[in-house]
Design a protein with these regions (language model features):
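Conserved alpha/beta-domain cores
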Residues: 2-18, 22-174
Length: 174
């Protein structure tokens, strides 16, 4: 069944991370980026501090310094584990969980996440944002994502963030 964006807006289509791709492509909406080092993410989600917040991105790239990457990875794992526990303890339902994306720095960091995140932690995530995405790194991002998807028990998605849209479109049109 195809959903049209207009119908979703008018009818207020319900969705969660398990919804179809046709729904999720529109449901992401305005994504709230926050550093993965932020310590109140779990509390804010459980308490529904921002009930209209439908998607968030835990940022491992621009919002954190190079010297805090390891700390951010540790906090990211903790955040995902706490959200999983909250769902197991019925403090949070999949319908109240925002769509959670992780913005990685590069394909290698995606592989690091594949090797360090548990299946439970991966189950909380909806997908990943790939920054500075262009023809020079497309294949590597896709390979790393496919490796991670193979480990996950749930469907994951990715959002490429294009470096230079005009240049990319012109190249693809030729």
């Amino acid at each position: 069944m195809q959903y049209e964006f207009k119908d979703m807006l008018i009818n207020g289509t319900e969705f969660n991370k398990g919804s179809s791709r046709e729904v999720l492509q529109y449901a992401i909406g305005g994504m709230l980026y926050m550093p993965a080092t932020r310590t109140k993410i779990v509390q804010d989600v459980i308490e529904q501090k921002n009930p209209d917040m439908k998607s968030i991105c835990l940022d491992l790239e621009d919002s954190i310094g190079d010297d805090t990457v390891e700390e951010a990875l540790i906090l990211l794992k903790s955040t995902l584990s706490k959200l999983y526990t909250a769902m197991e303890e019925d403090k949070l339902s999949v319908d109240n969980l925002p769509l959670i994306f992780i913005r990685v720095r590069n394909p290698e960091q995606l592989r690091t996440l594949k090797n360090t995140l548990s299946q439970e932690q991966l189950g909380i995530i909806t997908g990943f944002n790939f920054p500075k995405f262009d023809s020079s790194n497309t294949a590597e991002y896709i390979r790393a994502f496919n490796e991670l998807q193979h480990k996950s028990l749930t469907k994951l998605y990715f959002n490429p963030i294009l470096v230079d849209v005009n240049n990319y479109v012109e190249r693809e049109m030729d």
